[in-house]
């Protein structure tokens, strides 16, 4: 299941940054990096530090600190290497720290008792799902700008209707097994 469309994790950047495909891809790439690395590091910390020392009650705080450090790293790299993308992401880049998708993936991995490898693979899958959803939404929104939409649905309403239709489409994948 797609974390954005089925569990509504990370909906703020999904709706806010999905106006242009390039910006959405940049945000998706940043989220892929942060979620993947955060899943690995938080799983290591949980399984080898917090759990053995009976410090499980600190997992949310520790996870947020790990995520914040990773986001700072991404922010520095983007500012130095890709200043145009850094500017276009604006306030949404530092908000990855509080993006519930990033924290949610880490917490769900712990809740499901995933090991380090399973947690990392879960992070990769979840983040690629986020990337796919945000890029698809951006592509649809770019096409919608050329459409004659009733004034009642212009702006946020049509975006929410589109997100709902995407969620229905992604739910169809839930019954597909390989």
Where are these regions (language model features)?
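Generic transmembrane alpha-helix signature in multi-pass membrane proteins
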Residues: 8-12, 16, 75-81, 90-93, ...
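Cytoplasmic-side transmembrane-helix entry/capping segments in multi-pass membrane proteins
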Residues: 23-34, 57-63, 85-97, 152-158
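Interfacial loop-to-helix junctions that mark the boundaries of transmembrane helices
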Residues: 48-62, 117, 121-125, 150-155, ...
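Structural signature of hydrophobic alpha-helical transmembrane segments
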Residues: 2-6, 54-69, 121-133
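C-terminal ends of transmembrane helices
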Residues: 9-23, 71-85, 137-148
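Ordered, amphipathic secondary-structure segments that act as subunit-interaction surfaces
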Residues: 47-90
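Hydrophobic core segments of alpha-helical transmembrane domains in multi-pass membrane transport
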Residues: 13, 31, 36, 40, ...
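Interfacial loop-to-transmembrane junctions
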Residues: 142-160
């Amino acid at each position: 299941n797609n974390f954005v469309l089925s569990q509504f994790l990370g909906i703020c950047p999904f709706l806010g940054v999905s106006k242009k495909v390039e910006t959405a891809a940049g945000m998706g790439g940043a989220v892929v990096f942060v979620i993947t690395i955060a899943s690995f590091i938080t799983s290591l910390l949980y399984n080898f530090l917090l759990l053995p020392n009976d410090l499980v009650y600190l997992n949310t705080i520790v996870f947020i600190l790990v995520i914040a450090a990773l986001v700072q790293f991404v922010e520095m790299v983007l500012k130095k290497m890709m200043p145009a993308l850094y500017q276009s992401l604006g306030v949404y880049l530092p908000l990855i720290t509080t993006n519930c998708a990033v924290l949610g993936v880490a917490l769900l991995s712990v809740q499901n008792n995933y090991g380090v490898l399973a947690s990392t693979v879960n992070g990769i899958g979840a983040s690629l799902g986020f990337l796919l959803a945000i890029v698809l939404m951006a592509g649809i929104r770019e096409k919608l700008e050329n459409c004659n939409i009733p004034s009642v649905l212009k702006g946020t309403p049509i975006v929410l209707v589109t997100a709902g239709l995407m969620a229905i489409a992604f739910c169809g994948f839930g019954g597909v097994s390989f």
